[in-house]
């Protein structure tokens, strides 16, 4: 099983690359790692806010996969600020949970 130290190092590695190469407005760690829980199936879940991204989600992920090098299983969710605002107005429980329980790694709190 992967140790907390290994996850912490990989999170730092990925976040540094994101800041340097992808230039997001905000990065939030969510899921089990944000809660400090490590299980066999744990991966790194990152919620990213960025204004200038492709229209479709799959294109956003392809863009990230081409830029960012990572060693551990990492999932990215990318929203434009206006998409985030819209999801919150709709009361999206998934997004609300990320913002309430996630850990801001980069950007204003």
Where are the model-predicted features located?
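Catalytic core of pol beta-like nucleotidyltransferases
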Residues: 1-26, 35-40, 50-109
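Short beta-strand->loop micro-motif that forms the acidic, two-metal-ion catalytic signature
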Residues: 45-49
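P-loop (Walker A) phosphate-binding loop of NTP-binding proteins
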Residues: 32
